[in-house]
Regions:
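Active-site SXXK
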Residues: 122, 134-164, 309
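Charged, often glycine-rich, active-site loop that binds/positions anionic groups
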Residues: 127-131, 170-182
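Short, conserved catalytic-motif segment at the N-terminal edge
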Residues: 103, 108-132
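Active-site-adjacent helix/loop patches that line small-molecule binding or acyl-intermediate pockets
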Residues: 78, 82-94, 166-167, 180-258
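Active-site-proximal beta-strand/loop segments in catalytic clefts of secreted hydrolases
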Residues: 117-119, 167, 195-199, 207-210, ...
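Structural recognition of the beta-strand scaffold that forms the well-ordered cores
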Residues: 113-116, 136, 194, 228-230, ...
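A conserved catalytic-loop motif detector
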Residues: 238-290
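Structured C-terminal helix/loop/strand segments within mature extracytoplasmic catalytic/sensor domains
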Residues: 2-106, 124, 209, 215, ...
Length: 350
């Protein structure tokens, strides 16, 4: 009896052991498969993130649902329709929306260059960002930053007034007016204000003299970034790329306290024009640049989630290298593109 009980018990344990072994054989492949799937997902996620960080037309990294995007679209629809700028912002990338507008306006793809970066997520978009564009007066922003660096290093004083009677100039009449208005000498804060708020040339040349002249100043622009294009910063021929300038804006953003005076001046510059033309009740720090065929603007836009944008254009409104006046059509189109970029940001990123 006891022998039979032991035998039965041994058989029972053997059956249980065999069942566990079989179960293990079934479960282990599932675990292995799950680990392989997780590894594949991790690799795919890593590749996706890497792609998004480059300036491509990748899908925006936005946590907003389609319902949330449509809600903003409906809220902003009256303004969109009034401006004639109703586009499918929620279902298009930023370059796609801008390209659609350009197609509607008959603007050639080569006429627009921009770089955009959302400062919260790091999402970037660009169009023709390595294409050489005429910089206009946008060089005056990094020029002012260089002078602030010298002041911070104790090499220049904000109180001292510097002689401007022999300063280089582009227009003699403007130069003579400044000499008369400031009794032949300007302080650095005066130079900053008039070169940034009003984008005047004489105070910009006076700032450059504090650094050793324009050639020396231009050679230092690489402090704030370098483009992957042939033109690395801003050339002495007044050419640049948005790939470079977006780095200048990010450097400015990351050092706001140091450059607070610059931010103030570009914050009050050109009210109702350039990036501010159709964007009301919104704080915008902008440095426009106009010369001949070029109408440009570089901006830090204080939306709910701030972003930076470098927008450069050529030949808008029929302007040419021989143009001496700003094209009314061209300046309006710059404002419309600014609205489109901002609306896309509101819908997808805010």
């Amino acid at each position: 009896m006891i022998k039979n009980d032991i035998k039965n018990l041994a058989c029972w344990f053997g059956g249980v052991f065999l069942f566990i072994c079989c179960l293990g054989l079934l479960v282990e492949p599932q675990r292995a498969g799950k680990k392989m799937a997780e590894a594949s997902q991790s690799i795919a996620s890593s590749q996706s993130t890497e792609g998004e960080e480059t300036r491509t037309e990748a899908t925006a990294r936005s946590s907003k649902t389609m319902e949330e995007k449509q809600e903003v679209m409906e809220q902003d629809l009256p303004t969109m329709e009034a401006l004639g700028l109703s586009y499918d912002y929620a279902n298009m990338t930023l370059p796609q929306v801008v390209q659609t507008y350009m197609d509607d306006m008959g603007i050639d793809p080569s006429q627009i260059s921009f770089s955009y970066k959302d400062l919260t997520s790091g999402q970037t978009y660009a169009m023709n960002d390595t294409q050489s564009m005429t910089a206009g007066s946008t060089y005056k922003l990094p020029l002012n930053m260089l002078v602030v660096d010298e002041v911070a290093a104790g090499k220049l004083s904000l109180e001292e007034r510097f002689d401007i009677t022999n300063t280089s100039y582009e227009y003699k009449g403007e130069h003579d007016n400044y000499v008369a208005a400031f009794n032949g000498a300007m302080s650095i804060p005066d130079m900053q204000e008039y070169s940034l708020v009003y984008s005047e040339n004489t105070p910009a040349y006076a700032l450059a003299e504090r650094l050793g002249g324009m050639d020396k100043a231009y050679s230092m622009f690489g402090r704030y970034g370098r483009s992957k294009a042939k033109v690395k910063t801003i050339s002495r021929e007044n050419k640049t790329t948005t790939d470079y300038y977006i780095q200048v804006l990010e450097y400015l953003w990351n050092n706001q306290e140091k450059y607070k005076d610059i931010l103030y001046f570009i914050g009050v510059s050109f009210p109702g024009e350039y990036y501010k033309r159709y964007l009301y009740d919104l704080t915008i720090y902008q440095k426009p640049g106009y010369v001949r065929e070029a109408l440009n603007v570089d901006a830090i836009v204080m939306e709910e989630k701030p972003y930076i944008v470098a927008l450069y254009t050529a030949y808008l409104g029929g302007s040419t290298e021989a143009s001496e006046e700003i094209s009314g059509v061209g300046i309006d189109q710059v404002g419309q593109i600014a609205y489109i970029i901002n609306e896309w940001h509101r819908v997808n990123m805010n």
